[in-house]
Swiss-Prot record:
It comes from the Eukaryota. This is Homeobox protein MSX-2. It comes from Gallus gallus (Chicken). The gene is MSX2. Gene3D superfamilies: Homeodomain-like. Acts as a transcriptional regulator in bone development. Binds to DNA. Morphogenetic role.
Length: 259
């Protein structure tokens, strides 16, 4: 018969055995959880179950996976022990290399292939003025005839029939030739006069604003008073008029009419 101390040891060992087994089983379960500290440190992830909806597209996924493996050799699926950023770094470097080497050359080839053909610009045809078929040739005047015609034109721009007949006979010319020469000379004088007037306008343009001209002198007191209106019952003294270019309104309207 065993002593009481031995019985207590056996009893305690029997009680501690199941308790220790339960603790070990609990530790194993805790360590097997995917969000535990040990699982995160060891970076061991349990295989994820594919949903039922993705089962039909397994063939497409396989083809996409094979094509990716063919495009990027050596950059397969990330192992369980590889760092998280390894795949992204390799993919970035591979994409940069492909853009620099293949995409650049292909783009240049495409641009050279579809370049537009060079344009052959034809010179513009110069359109000449067509003269009449029955046009008379120009009269070749001599130097003495031209001097006599100019002297006569300065004296008188319009000749009578008798004067033209006498003058043409003295120069050995026809009346028609003298008549046409005087017509052309009057047109030339008119053009020269218009050019001189245009030069005078351009020279006097900085003195007055553009598009402005006064038909009367503005410094006259009577005409300056007429700007304020003489029909007003109480006449005001004449005020000094400011520069007209400061106002965009017409000169006939004043502040007293608008008030």
């Amino acid at each position: 018969m065993a002593s009481p101390s031995k019985a207590k040891e056996v009893f305690s060992s029997d009680e501690e055995g199941p308790a220790a087994g339960a603790e070990e089983h609990h530790k194993v379960k805790v360590s097997s959880l995917p969000f535990s500290v040990e699982a995160l440190m060891s970076d061991k992830k349990p295989p994820k179950e594919l949903p039922l909806a993705a089962a039909g597209g397994s063939a497409d996924g396989a083809t996409v996976g094979t094509s990716r493996n063919l495009l990027l050799p050596g950059h397969g699926s990330r192992d369980a022990h590889s760092p998280p950023g390894a795949l992204t770094k390799t993919f970035d470097t591979a994409s940069v290399k492909s853009e620099n080497s293949e995409d650049g050359t292909s783009w240049i080839q495409e641009a050279g292939r579809y370049s537009p053909p060079p344009r052959h610009l034809s010179p513009t045809a110069c359109t000449l003025r067509k003269h009449k078929t029955n046009r008379k040739p120009r009269t070749p005047f001599t130097t003495s005839q031209l001097l006599a015609l100019e002297r006569k034109f300065r004296q008188k721009q319009y000749l009578s029939i008798a004067e033209r007949a006498e003058f043409s006979s003295s120069l050995n010319l026809t009346e028609t030739q003298v008549k046409i020469w005087f017509q052309n000379r009057r047109a030339k004088a008119k053009r020269l006069q218009e050019a001189e007037l245009e030069k005078l306008k351009m020279a006097a343009k900085p003195m007055l604003p553009s598009g402005f001209s006064l038909p009367f002198p503005i410094n006259s007191p009577i005409q300056a008073a007429s700007l304020y209106g003489t029909s007003y019952p109480f006449h005001r003294p004449v005020l000094p008029i400011p520069p007209v270019g400061l106002y965009a309104t017409p000169v006939g309207y004043s502040m007293y009419h608008l008030s």
